[in-house]
Curated annotation (Swiss-Prot):
Pfam families: Fn3-like (PF14310), Glyco_hydro_3 (PF00933), Glyco_hydro_3_C (PF01915). The keyword Iron does not apply. Gene3D superfamilies: Glycoside hydrolase family 3 C-terminal domain (3.40.50.1700), Glycoside hydrolase, family 3, N-terminal domain (3.20.20.300), Immunoglobulins (2.60.40.10). This is Beta-glucosidase A. It comes from Aspergillus kawachii (strain NBRC 4308).
Length: 860
């Protein structure tokens, strides 16, 4: 019997499993067509108006990248010059403009999560959007909430926010709003259940010596999908995200970019997504089935990098002409792309790209990879940084988590001799950008590695910033940055008034192997002898302060409770202003108010939720079974009664706060009604015509390997170049896939983000918070809910806010709980419902420090 998405999955195959034993993703067709619901109406109508004037080839040109390394951006679509529609520039990354110059390198998404600050998330998004816009990029390939962070050693966790879906969802949405308010389309990625680097792409894994033929499959049940991994994407869609990027992995043994259940049903029918779905680069595996399953844009356009062949382009034109892909589906692709373009106002701000992703030379061939086209200026060296360094410094400081403080901080500036110890204090000897895509761990760590990076315009190291502080006060500072020079470290620490020890742990994307870490971390220990560096300093200095730059939690149990370790700070991946933002906290200019966005366990085993790092299904797709369900991070620790070292939401301050006066009030709200009715029939725009209308234009000078939408012959088989052309469509067209008739509206659907009634506010919760210390500071009240039920987490985060209070100041913090906040996913009804189990609310400063609690009244 095959497992479906609606059933719990618990496979432990060690050899090739039969198809009937593998997790199974049920089909869902046809692909829903956009209709302009929510606040998309105006953009949708403009898109319909322009697409109605396009030929089939022009529509196809919007959907297909022109090929890897050919034009200036990492992804580029064709345009419709006749109608004034330019080709669109798509560019990484979630923390700044990748492969460019004179751009900012922002703190990671994980650092934004550590701020717990919605406004900073928005401001960072807007600042990034401004830089993308100024560089001529139309679509930012970010932000990310996939990976969510199921496993603490997942390689790309730092690109996202937090393993908590509510914290991730709010900051994901605010980032998207900021990017799009700057006139750039934001891309919510990687959709969905993309939680490890191992086996994400079969060719990549084969390059590492793994004998597999298909990408790994994330296997999870329907409740886990909705309550955990889909949750932040619902927030993104409700926030108006223009694009969603489907992921490399399979979900229940169906590829992410042709999975009709996750794309057609969950994203488009249930969440009401009105924008377009693009493939991750080379995650497009089939032409017709991808189109019918809900893919709208193929990136970077070619089947294999620089191959000159494409599943779409000419082949998508052929597929419409021969009837295997209905006209309405391609019309819908084009409308979705143009609606996103218009929704953010890109047409008013459009400027051509003024940089090349492939060279820093000022001049080069227009079509880089094939050295064809005019030899022209490709890099204009436009400085787009504005005053964003100030925001970056602020986020860096506001995301620095104070984990321990035995009165050592803040520093006074009167310390006579400051020792700066550890490689992480200093510079990469090759330069801040000396390793391609930051694929090394040399010097201080300010971002992970992979496509989710950006070039630093500069990098202020801790050594530089702290030395400036010490010298300003006319005291002494000495540095030891060789992590294996233990004797010298011990000697320096002996002489110091305070030893600041810098350690790190890195990770990134799977195409880069750093010290045997294939993207994912091999373990949670500190890198480059970090534990021994700390112990050497602490054994010789009774005022040792540890600063951790890492991509997630690390194991600190060897030294965290050493009395000579007087303070511990986690700085995450703070970006270009790393040293300055840290100095602001160390010297008390900024009172730390950050909270850990993940749990710090005593051992790797405490987390469970293991990565699959060896094939477990013969040479078939490795099976990644999410048997823990919704119990990841603090939820799993709570379930297993596992005591962490530092819990989720934990963080100290230079002041103290008191919580009191919890009040709960029921609000008036409409009753919940499942969505019902039917959609309109699929619209079509314009006439298709016949093959003779789509031959290559006379006089066109074709560029080698460039992906075009036209035909080289009216013989469709000859034009397709597909060896299996002519196969009976009944062999591969799923039932209902080409049906453009009216379709039922799902109960959980009805608007962007799902049923609008889910967002009704049902309960108001208020507490009084007082600063009981002597200095001003920020506090983050956190509201958790117990949903009741025998198989539910003990508590789940639902609301939070970062607030600033002066000494002795108190404030009343109020927030609301929506129907969605109190609901569970009902697998049988395929809808959200508030169960009859008793519910409670908890408020406090971390997931394990919740002094206020109350029973919640019954609501529906």
């Amino acid at each position: 019997m095959r497992f479906t998405l609606i059933e719990a999955v618990a496979l432990t195959a060690v050899s090739l499993a039969s198809a009937d034993e593998l997790a199974y993703s049920p089909p869902y067709y046809p692909s829903p067509w956009a209709n302009g619901q929510g606040d998309w109406a105006q953009a949708y109508q403009r898109a319909v108006d322009i697409v109605s004037q396009m030929t089939l080839a022009e529509k196809v040109n919007l959907t297909t990248g022109t090929g890897w390394e050919l034009e200036l951006c990492v992804g580029q679509t064709g345009g419709v010059p006749r109608l004034g529609v330019p080709g669109m520039c798509l560019q990484d990354s979630p923390l700044g403009v990748r492969d460019s110059d004179y751009n900012s390198a922002f703190p990671s998404g994980m650092n934004v999560a550590a701020t717990w600050d919605k406004n900073l998330a928005y401001l960072r998004g807007k600042a990034m959007g401004q830089e993308f816009s100024d560089k001529g990029a139309d679509i930012q390939l970010g932000p990310a909430a996939g990976p969510l962070g199921r496993s603490p050693d997942g390689g790309r966790n730092w690109e996202g926010f937090s393993p908590d879906p509510a914290l991730s969802g709010v900051l994901f949405a605010e980032t998207i709003k900021g990017i799009q308010d700057a006139g750039v389309v934001a891309t919510a990625k990687h959709y969905i259940a993309y939680e490890q680097e191992h086996f994400r792409q079969a060719p990549e894994a084969q390059g590492y010596g793994f004998n597999i033929s298909e990408s790994g499959s994330a296997n999870l049940d329907d409740k886990t999908m909705h309550e955990l991994y889909l949750w932040p994407f619902a927030d993104a869609i409700r926030a108006g995200a223009g694009a969603v990027m489907c992921s490399y992995n399979q979900i229940n043994n169906s590829y992410g970019c042709q999975n009709s259940y996750t794309l057609n049903k969950l994203l488009k029918a249930e969440l009401g997504f009105q924008g377009f779905v693009m493939s991750d680069w080379a995650a497009h595996h089939a032409g017709v089935s991808g189109a019918l399953a809900g893919l709208d844009m193929s990136m970077p356009g070619d089947v294999d990098y620089d191959s000159g062949t494409s599943y779409w382009g000419t082949n998508l034109t052929v597929s419409v002409l021969n009837g295997t892909v209905p006209q309405w589906r391609v019309d819908d692709m084009a409308v979705r792309i143009m609606a996103a373009y218009y929704k953010v106002g890109r047409d008013r701000l459009w400027t051509p790209p003024n940089f090349s992703s492939w060279t820093r030379d000022e001049y080069g061939y227009k079509y880089y990879y094939v050295s064809e086209g005019p030899y022209e200026k490709v890099n204009h060296y436009v400085n787009v940084q504005r005053n964003h360094s100030e925001l970056i410094r602020r986020i860096g400081a506001d995301s620095t988590v104070l984990l321990k403080n035995d009165g050592a901080l803040p520093l006074t500036g009167k310390e006579r001799l400051v020792a700066l110890i550890g490689e992480d204090a200093g510079s990469n000897p090759y330069g801040a950008n000396g390793c391609s895509d930051r694929g090394c761990d040399n010097g201080t760590l300010a971002m992970g590695w992979g496509s989710g990076t950006a070039n630093f315009p500069y990098l202020v190291t801790p050594e530089q910033a702290i030395s400036n502080e010490v010298l300003k006060n006319k005291n002494g500072v000495f540095t030891a940055t060789d992590n294996w020079a233990i004797d010298q470290i011990e000697a320096l620490a002996k002489t110091a008034s305070v030893s600041l020890v810098f350690v790190n742990a890195d990770s990134g994307e799977g195409y880069i192997n750093v010290d045997g870490n294939l993207g994912d971390r091999r373990n949670l220990t500190l890198w480059r002898n970090g534990d021994n560096v700390i112990k050497a300093a602490a054994s010789n200095c009774n005022n040792t302060i540890v600063i951790i730059h890492s991509v997630g939690p690390v194991l600190v149990n060897e030294w965290y409770d050493n009395p000579n370790v007087t303070a511990i700070l986690w700085g995450g991946l703070p970006g270009q202003e790393s040293g300055n933002s840290l100095a602001d906290v160390l010297y008390g200019r900024v009172n730390p108010g950050a909270k850990s966005p993940f749990t710090w366990g005593k051992t790797r085993e405490a987390y469970q939720d293991y990565l699959v790092t060896e094939p477990n299904n013969g040479n078939g797709a490795p099976q990644e079974d999410f048997v823990e369900g919704v119990f990841i991070d603090y939820r799993g620790f709570d379930k297993r009664n596992e005591t962490p070292i530092y819990e989720f939401g934990y963080g100290l301050s230079y002041t103290t706060f008191n919580y009191s006066n919890l009040e709960v009030q029921v609000l008036s709200a409409p009753a919940y009604e499942p969505a019902s009715g039917e959609t309109e029939a699929a619209p079509t725009f314009g006439e298709v015509g016949n093959a003779s209308n789509y031959l290559y234009p006379d006089g066109l000078q074709k560029i080698t390997k460039f992906i075009y939408p036209w035909l080289n012959s009216t013989d469709l088989e000859a034009s397709s170049g597909d060896a299996s052309y002519g196969q009976d469509s009944s062999d591969y067209l799923p039932e209902g896939a080409t049906d453009g008739s009216a379709q039922p509206i799902l109960p959980a659907g009805g608007g962007p983000g799902g049923n609008p009634r889910l967002y009704d506010e049902l309960i108001r919760v208020s507490v009084t918070i007082k600063n009981t210390g002597k200095v001003a500071g920020d506090e983050v009240p956190q509201l958790y809910v117990s949903l009741g039920g025998p198989n539910e987490p003990k508590i789940v985060l639902r609301q939070f806010e970062r607030i600033t209070l002066q000494p002795s100041e108190e404030t009343k913090w109020s927030t609301t709980l929506t129907r969605r906040d109190l609901a569970n996913w009902n697998v049988e009804k395929q809808d959200w419902e508030i169960t009859s189990y008793p519910k409670m609310v908890f408020v406090g400063s971390s997931s394990r420090k919740l002094p206020l609690r109350a029973s919640l009244p019954t609501v529906h």
